[in-house]
Amino acid sequence: LHRVDRRQRQMCIRDRYLYSAAQTLGITRDEMMDQLISGKAKYSSIFNYPTPTWADMGAIGWLVDGAAICNQVPLCRASYGPYGRAMVRVCKEESFHQRQGFEILLSLMQGTDEQKQMAQDAVNRWYWPSLAMFGPPDDQSPNSAQSMKWKIKRFTNDELRQRFVGMLVPQAEILGVTLPDPDLRLDDETGQYVIGEIDWDEFFEVLRGNGPCNAERLERRRTAHEEGAWVREAAAEYARKQALKTKAAA
């Protein structure tokens, strides 16, 4: 449990990095929070899937955070400095999460038949959503071309997805899990893996707010924001009083 707690704290710190980078573009944190809880702001589609067992923690770490690392390491060299510097810190944390997830799955795969099945079921749940995290195919991506032009992104969605699959296959063999893609194969001519068709209809439905947990996630965020109002108000009042003391002492 202490590892889960550490992970949650790191996620909060990561949010601060990214919100701070976004603030350099002229938007306030309050505005971004209002956009989030109103449903206007987009956020990663992967956060809208349920986690029914402990094995999901392992699959999320290995697959989801592994995909995030593959996507975010090149962003450390993004043309926009505040974003690139934030990514350097984020990637250091993601590497811990990825190793933690791999370790959880490895432990389960060395356990009972029930534990092995639990690990495999979790991999089955998270494999395809993790591949979709890189975004639509290059010929259907509305933002990739502009991001590449501005040198925010250095590789296309499909290039990053291919790299990710290339890393997953040998790791899956070590774990002893099966990647749930009957069409997955190595192309001898290109040396790259060919994957099955991703369900892009599901991906876009989740982005539209119709995923398994979209409504629940936003409602919890709204509730936390409302119940935490007194903390923000107290902090603001404390800052005001400290400013008055500093001014009086000057």
Predicted regions and their residues:
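Acidic/His metal-coordination segments adjacent to aromatic residues that form catalytic metal sites
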Residues: Q35-G61, G111-Q115, W126-I152
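Active-site-adjacent scaffolding segments
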Residues: D15-A78
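Single conserved hydrophobic/aromatic residue that forms the stacking wall/gate
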Residues: L1-I13
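Short, contiguous, pocket-lining structural segments
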Residues: M57-A67, A86, E93-H97, L160
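Extended, helix-rich structural scaffolds rather than catalytic motifs
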Residues: Q117-A250
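Inter-helical turn/loop segments and adjacent helix faces that build the functional surface
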Residues: N71-R89, E103-M118, P136-W150
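Alpha-helical scaffold segments in carbohydrate-active enzymes
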Residues: Q10, R14-S20, R89-S107, A122-A132
